[in-house]
């Protein structure tokens, strides 16, 4: 019987991020954290690629603008900036049967653990100043979660 692998999202801000070909990949939730960058609060959700191939088990991130509630960090509490921002929209695209939330700080992150999701992966080719990055420094990110892959 095969041994289930355990992906460890130990990506530090100074580490080089993975680069895989752009496209649609099936991913699973690993964990999340909140952080502050350039004066803005963010939520970073780590996903692991489950498609067999060269990208298998690659850890990719999806970043959302949020407001941190309390201290930022691993499993930090947050709320999306608005009810129609990308986090609530993608949450309900991936969990269409989830009940309607009445407060933005009540998005159940535990729901992410119960499925496989389709993610559109793109390559970051420019830095924050919109200057081209050398190929060696380019990396992949999840631009959008498209919905459940296991339904």
Residue ranges and their predicted role:
Residues 1-151:
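Short beta-rich binding modules
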